From Swiss-Prot:
Keywords: Cytoplasm, DNA-binding, Transcription, Transcription regulation
Subcellular location: Cytoplasm
Biological processes per GO annotation: regulation of DNA-templated transcription
Homology family: Belongs to the TACO1 family.
One of the record's GO molecular function terms: DNA binding
Cellular component GO terms, alphabetical: cytosol
Superkingdom classification of source: Bacteria
Region of interest (Disordered), ranges: 1-22
InterPro entries, A to Z: Integrase-like_N (IPR017856), TACO1_YebC-like_2nd/3rd_dom (IPR048300), TACO1_YebC_N (IPR049083), Transcrip_reg_TACO1-like (IPR002876), Transcrip_reg_TACO1-like_dom3 (IPR026564), YebC-like (IPR029072)
Protein name (database record): Probable transcriptional regulatory protein Ldb0677
SUPFAM superfamilies membership: YebC-like
């Protein structure tokens, strides 16, 4: 694996997300609602809902908000959202994937297209960049919550079935095959680890450095996409600055 660190990016964007907390919770509520609507209200029997709830908890979404979204799905609400993926290139030729949950595909497609166009990117056709990413399980353990050293952590990750362990001063990052993610997550929790993040994500097979003269425009594009009410996730193949 490339050594691409999602945790570095997550931490780097945390303050910006905190400022948009209301919008983040609204998006998470939508994900929880659709997961519960399609697979039932019990996270233990609904893997998609478990993922949505874990994601909400990682974002410090209040328990009442989570329960409200599940209750709404159990009720008579006829709201429906479609999952849509958009693909393209950011400034500097960096591949970018956008996942959305929308009740109006035309509106969302238009908004995403405008974001790309206004910020130096180009929206591509379906399949234009998706093949450059792999679906992976992603787990983060904050090192302040465990006494395990790197050797112990590696042993436990391998025993649980994880594919890759990356370490930094503040966190252990674990990547798994998408199909084995649930088993790895459950095994690590059973071993007593507290998981700061546990999710399915898209990981680039290779990363591309963002040219210095394109960095500001690149960040504006990502911000514009993440600000869209319908956009759930934005994945890029941008190399970390330290790579």
């Amino acid at each position: 694996m490339s050594g691409h660190s999602k945790w570095h990016n997550i931490q780097g964007r945390k303050n910006a997300q905190d400022a948009k907390r209301g919008k983040v919770f609204q998006k998470l509520s939508r994900e929880i609602y659709m997961a519960a609507k399609s697979g039932g209200p019990d996270p233990l029997g609904n893997p998609r809902l478990r993922l949505a709830v874990d994601k909400a908890r990682a974002a410090n979404m209040p328990k009442d908000n989570i329960q409200r979204a599940i209750k709404k799905a159990e009720g008579n609400s006829d709201e429906h959202y479609d999952e849509v993926t958009y693909e393209g290139y950011a400034p500097g030729g960096v591949a970018i994937l956008v996942e959305a949950l929308t009740d109006n595909k035309n509106r969302t497609a238009s908004s995403v297209r405008v974001a790309f166009t206004r910020n130096g990117g180009s929206l591509g056709a379906t399949g234009s960049v998706a093949y450059m990413f792999d679906r992976k399980g992603y787990i983060v353990i904050d090192r302040s919550t465990t006494d395990a050293d790197e050797d112990q952590m590696l042993m436990d990750v391998m025993e649980a079935g994880g594919d890759d362990l990356q370490t930094s001063d503040d966190a252990y990052e674990i990547y798994t095959d998408a199909k084995s993610f649930t088993a790895v997550r459950d095994a690590l929790e059973k071993a007593g680890y507290q998981l700061a993040v546990s999710e399915l994500t898209m990981v680039p097979q290779n990363t591309t450095p963002v040219p210095a003269d394109k960095k500001e425009q690149f960040e504006k594009l990502v911000d514009a996409l993440e600000d869209d009410d319908d956009v759930s996730n934005v994945y890029t193949a941008a190399a970390d600055e330290e790579e």
